[in-house]
Amino acid sequence: MEKVLALVLLTLAVAYAAPDPRGLIINLDNGELCLNSAQCKSQCCQHDSPLGLARCADKARENSGCSPQTIYGIYYLCPCERGLTCDGDKSIIGAITNTNYGICQDPQSKK
């Protein structure tokens, strides 16, 4: 038990001693491998194929392809930037398979 406690304390000491503000698990920059969008500074963890590695990426800009926010936290197309909405077809199957795609639009410019 004492060895386990010493190992945990040593691990914590090494983690806190690292001067780099970039995280190893959270606060990841674009291009770094991720498992969930919560790990990324941009809040988007994107992959190109079901078997591809996911990497942090920028959120979708106006008139770009997008995915609505999902509970999965990994996207084929990133959700829209703040203030934009992802307009597109939505279906139950698309929600399950994470393939509901749309275009980022500014809700203020719609009439």
Curated annotation (Swiss-Prot):
Signal peptide as annotated in the record: 1-17
GO molecular function, one term: lipase binding
Record's keyword terms, sorted: Digestion, Disulfide bond, Lipid degradation, Lipid metabolism, Secreted, Signal
Annotated InterPro entries: CLPS_chr, Colipase, Colipase_C, Colipase_CS, Colipase_N
Compartment(s) where it occurs, according to its Swiss-Prot or TrEMBL record: Secreted
Pfam family, one: Colipase_C
Function: Colipase is a cofactor of pancreatic lipase. It allows the lipase to anchor itself to the lipid-water interface. Without colipase the enzyme is washed off by bile salts, which have an inhibitory effect on the lipase. Enterostatin has a biological activity as a satiety signal.
Name of the protein: Colipase
Gene that specifies this protein: CLPS
